Design a protein with these regions (language model features):
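Gram-negative bacterial Sec-dependent N-terminal signal peptides
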Residues: 1-22
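A residue-level marker of the well-folded mature domains of exported/periplasmic proteins
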Residues: 3-4, 21-314
Length: 314
């Protein structure tokens, strides 16, 4: 059982008692996800592959097919191919919501249970939606920054891309700072890239002689931020707060690194939650339709070990 699932679902949801009864009940779940083109996606692929093995062991009649695609067009073609294999359910993290909505609709038209992960479709045709909490990531981050700075300080923000989930995170962060004397003195897009974040942080360091903390909402970008701070030799920055749960950052939290004292989860392992729920719906006939939003958990030294996956690429 994945450590991430501890406390997220009732123990009865994945009880093994009925597994033997399902041995002759053959079903197929297809998992369609982007190829590992960056760290977070690499983590998604890792957790999907690990969960596929766990589910096939839990339900002897189950076959799980994990298919990665390099772009939206390839993913649409993959969905068409997967439906020819007689699948009962599809777990899909779309490359692009607009491009994949109609191909997913076609799969659903073949009486296939649809679970969408992370990126919502243009039209909510899915049976189950599993995602991280984007506003929650901003809210939890703001609360931590306020407390860590004692309610007063100068913060720079490195945003992701100019899309909805970035707006949700940043708006919640700004709202969470209200009532304090913590000020956002600069904000730029880092495109969820460690190289771009490195350049943005270099600019911040040149422009601002005093920075108390950095919020960059993403652990890949935090890597670039840390390198920029190191090269500049700056000692005024008290800490950097990223997000997602990259193993390198979680390890720093575990080890008591003063520069990375915490992290906020937006876990790639959400795909495993989606797969678990989908299988439970197929085999245990549990009412799993609807939305399942994972908490934006604050990772500290006290709980970091529960979210550390040393074998994951992310």
């Amino acid at each position: 059982m994945r450590k991430l699932l501890t406390g997220l679902m009732t123990a009865g949801l994945f009880a093994l008692a009925g597994a033997a009864a399902h041995a002759a009940d053959s079903k197929t779940i297809a998992v369609s996800i982007p190829a590992a083109d960056h760290g977070w996606t690499g983590g998604v692929v890792y957790h999907a592959q690990q969960e596929a093995k766990a589910l096939e062991a839990r339900y002897p009649g189950l076959k799980v097919i994990v298919k990665t695609s390099p772009d939206g067009a390839a993913q649409a073609n993959a969905l068409e191919d997967l439906t020819t294999q007689g699948i009962n359910a599809l777990v899909v993290l779309p490359h692009n919501s607009d491009e994949l909505t109609d191909p997913i609709r076609q799969v659903k038209g073949k009486n296939v249970f649809i679970t969408v992960v992370d990126r919502a479709l243009r039209d909510p045709i899915q049976d189950l939606y599993v995602a991280g909490n984007n506003p929650g990531l901003g809210t939890v981050s703001a609360a931590y920054v306020k407390e860590k700075l004692g309610g007063k300080g100068d913060v720079v923000v490195i945003r992701g891309l100019p899309i909805v989930i970035d707006e949700q995170r940043v708006n919640a962060f700004n709202e969470g700072l209200k009532g304090s004397e913590v000020k956002v003195i600069d904000s730029q897009f880092g495109n969820w890239s460690r190289d771009d974040a490195f350049k943005v942080m270099q600019d911040f360091l040149t422009k601002h002689p005093k920075i108390d903390a950095v919020w960059c909402q993403d652990d890949d970008m935090a890597v670039g931020v840390l390198e920029a701070i190191k090269q500049a030799g700056r000692s005024d920055i008290k800490f950097v707060l990223g997000g997602a749960g990259m193993k390198d950052m979680v390890k720093k939290v575990m080890d008591g690194d003063a520069t990375i004292p915490a992290d906020v989860l937006y876990p790639p392992a959400m795909v495993a939650v989606a797969m678990d729920l989908t299988a439970a719906g197929l085999y245990d006939k549990l009412p799993v339709r609807g939305s399942y939003i994972l908490d934006a958990t604050l990772v500290t030294k006290d709980n970091a070990k529960d979210f550390y996956y040393p074998d994951s690429p992310f």
